[in-house]
Amino acid sequence: MKVVDFIVKHIDENGMTQSEAAAVAGMSRQNFWDKLNNRNPRFNTMTRILDAFGYQIHVVRKDGETLNFCEADFFAAAEKENLYYDSLEAILVSMGYLFEISKKAEK
């Protein structure tokens, strides 16, 4: 499932209005929906929105083995370069990795 579809599904399942969802994400309603309707949003934007809704992204190997690179360093580089989410995901997939979206642990 594409990240935008995941976010829209979360909004629908929680019965949120566009304005409510935007407020949770810390954006104006127009800006929020512009980001989602772009269909190829920036990685930084998607991680910010997912975080606001209580989700996080991890990189996992398709074969289930342990990552052979530092996930934190990868995310720092992705944030610095401000890449498109789908482009970054396509690179990972070509290398045998996937993005996995999961609920953040309760504090």
What are these regions (language model features)?
Residues 38-51:
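Short, basic-rich loop-to-helix N-cap that marks the start of a DNA-contacting helix
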Residues 60-107:
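Short, charged recognition helix plus adjacent turn
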Residues 46, 56, 88-89:
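Intrinsic low-complexity tandem-repeat regions in disordered proteins
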Residues 15-30:
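Short alpha-helical DNA-recognition segment
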Residues 1-16:
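A short, Lys/Arg-rich alpha-helix, primarily the initiator
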Residues 26-41:
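Recognition helix of helix-turn-helix/homeodomain-like DNA-binding domains
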